[in-house]
């Protein structure tokens, strides 16, 4: 990487880390402290959790279209400002409805797709996977810091301090964008070209080559949500206390990123690189089979989780990098935003389905459902394979 690429990569890593740190800190404590808010109940707490994903889905594509028409840097600043407003609302209105409205505004700053498109504008193709992998690491670091620090911060400073801290972190992110992220005009459509519309975006959604990646990230996060509905319960059945679960998550996530970086820097086999998506889906299938047969065997459960995390992190990197490689600058923001929308839809539907299935199916039946989803994903991935450049 040259200096500019390194500067851009590190800047976006810090932006993603600080922004997601503000989001993740609330996860371990919302179910407990949300009940203490005015009007709080289990349904509205669930709504306050899910509404962030819904607003992300609503605003991802509009933000992507705006980033293709105007400078991406300005759109990222707009999204961070919306995130800031959402935190101020959540911290100021001490009721469950204030939290719901604030969380909606937080999600409306839907800049994930825009950031990935901006990264692709500024980073050469041969270095793009490394940059995306670095951002993936920043996600993992923010999650690990958040699940440990969130309860501690709330214990000493109160529930609403989480949102004031998140608001401060969003200001830090805006400063980083202003002073460390360069302007790029590569994405802006020329005056003599017709600016694309929602009809054009619909064509992007239905394109079978792009659809392979949309389905891929949807299925990946759909399975992740179901996985995390089942894992804590299975660990406790095996005799592993809830207080120690974070140790397994920490170890497996760190190992998975170590394997990912070794692969990125040292794997030179073209056949493996071209088929990495299907190979990872097969490994996820293998991890589910181990998990299903593990029962109360803690070692097998951890091995299964390790294989899943390695495959998950590989797919997080290579799905987005393979897609961005096939896009021209003019439409990258729109298509990457559709991709991010698919990701949040997977999270939303995965969470809904996991709760619904858990209410009337047993452990084995849910995992057979997972196996069916993985096989369906594998079939779609093979069927939709092609080469295309827009």
Curated annotation (Swiss-Prot):
<feature type="transmembrane region" description="Helical">
    <location>
        <begin position="213"/>
        <end position="233"/>
    </location>
</feature>
<comment type="similarity">
    <text>Belongs to the major facilitator superfamily.</text>
</comment>
<dbReference type="InterPro" id="IPR036259">
    <property type="entry name" value="MFS_trans_sf"/>
</dbReference>
<protein>
    <recommendedName>
        <fullName>Uncharacterized transporter BU466</fullName>
    </recommendedName>
</protein>
<keyword id="KW-1133">Transmembrane helix</keyword>
<keyword id="KW-0813">Transport</keyword>
<feature type="transmembrane region" description="Helical">
    <location>
        <begin position="43"/>
        <end position="63"/>
    </location>
</feature>
<feature type="transmembrane region" description="Helical">
    <location>
        <begin position="162"/>
        <end position="182"/>
    </location>
</feature>
<keyword id="KW-0472">Membrane</keyword>
<feature type="transmembrane region" description="Helical">
    <location>
        <begin position="10"/>
        <end position="30"/>
    </location>
</feature>
<keyword id="KW-1003">Cell membrane</keyword>
<dbReference type="GO" id="GO:0022857">
    <property type="term" value="F:transmembrane transporter activity"/>
</dbReference>
<dbReference type="InterPro" id="IPR020846">
    <property type="entry name" value="MFS_dom"/>
</dbReference>
<feature type="transmembrane region" description="Helical">
    <location>
        <begin position="134"/>
        <end position="154"/>
    </location>
</feature>
<dbReference type="GO" id="GO:0005886">
    <property type="term" value="C:plasma membrane"/>
</dbReference>
<dbReference type="InterPro" id="IPR050171">
    <property type="entry name" value="MFS_Transporters"/>
</dbReference>
<dbReference type="Pfam" id="PF07690">
    <property type="entry name" value="MFS_1"/>
</dbReference>
<feature type="transmembrane region" description="Helical">
    <location>
        <begin position="298"/>
        <end position="318"/>
    </location>
</feature>
<feature type="transmembrane region" description="Helical">
    <location>
        <begin position="272"/>
        <end position="292"/>
    </location>
</feature>
<dbReference type="InterPro" id="IPR011701">
    <property type="entry name" value="MFS"/>
</dbReference>
<feature type="transmembrane region" description="Helical">
    <location>
        <begin position="81"/>
        <end position="101"/>
    </location>
</feature>
<feature type="transmembrane region" description="Helical">
    <location>
        <begin position="246"/>
        <end position="266"/>
    </location>
</feature>
<feature type="transmembrane region" description="Helical">
    <location>
        <begin position="341"/>
        <end position="361"/>
    </location>
</feature>
<keyword id="KW-0812">Transmembrane</keyword>
<feature type="transmembrane region" description="Helical">
    <location>
        <begin position="363"/>
        <end position="383"/>
    </location>
</feature>
């Amino acid at each position: 990487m040259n200096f500019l690429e390194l500067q851009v990569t590190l800047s976006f890593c810090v932006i993603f880390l600080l922004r997601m740190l503000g989001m993740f800190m609330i996860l371990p404590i919302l179910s407990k402290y949300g009940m203490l808010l005015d009007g709080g109940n289990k349904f509205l707490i669930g709504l306050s959790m899910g509404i962030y994903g819904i607003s992300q889905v609503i605003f991802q594509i509009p933000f992507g279209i705006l980033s293709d028409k105007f400078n991406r840097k300005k759109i990222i600043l707009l999204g961070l400002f919306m995130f800031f407003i959402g935190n101020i609302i959540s911290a100021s209105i001490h009721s469950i409805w204030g939290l719901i409205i604030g969380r909606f505004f937080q999600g409306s700053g839907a800049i994930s797709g825009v950031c990935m498109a901006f990264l692709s504008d500024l980073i050469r193709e041969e270095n793009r996977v490394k940059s995306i992998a670095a951002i993936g690491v920043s996600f993992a670091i923010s999650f690990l810091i958040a699940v440990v620090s969130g309860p501690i911060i709330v214990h000493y400073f109160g529930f609403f301090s989480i949102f004031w801290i998140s608001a401060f972190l969003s200001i830090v992110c805006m400063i980083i964008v202003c002073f460390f992220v360069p302007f790029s005009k590569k994405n802006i459509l020329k005056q003599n070209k017709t600016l694309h519309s929602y009809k054009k975006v619909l064509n992007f959604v239905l394109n079978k080559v792009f659809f392979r990646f949309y389905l891929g990230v949807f299925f990946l996060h759909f399975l992740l949500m179901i996985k995390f509905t089942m894992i804590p319960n299975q660990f406790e059945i095996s005799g592993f206390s809830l207080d120690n679960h974070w140790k397994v998550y920490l170890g497996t996530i760190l190992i998975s990123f170590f394997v990912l970086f070794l692969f990125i820097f040292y794997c030179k086999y073209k056949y493996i690189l071209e088929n990495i998506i299907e190979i990872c889906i097969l490994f996820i299938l293998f991890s589910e089979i181990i998990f299903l047969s593990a029962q109360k065997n803690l070692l097998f459960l951890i091995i299964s989780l390790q294989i899943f995390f390695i495959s998950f992190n590989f797919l997080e990197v290579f799905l987005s990098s393979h897609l961005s490689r096939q896009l021209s600058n003019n439409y990258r923001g729109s298509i990457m935003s559709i991709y991010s929308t698919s990701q949040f839809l997977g999270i939303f539907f995965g969470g809904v389905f996991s709760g619904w299935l858990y209410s009337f199916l047993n452990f084995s039946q849910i995992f057979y459902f997972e196996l069916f989803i993985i096989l369906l994903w594998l079939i779609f991935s093979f069927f939709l394979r092609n080469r295309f450049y827009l």
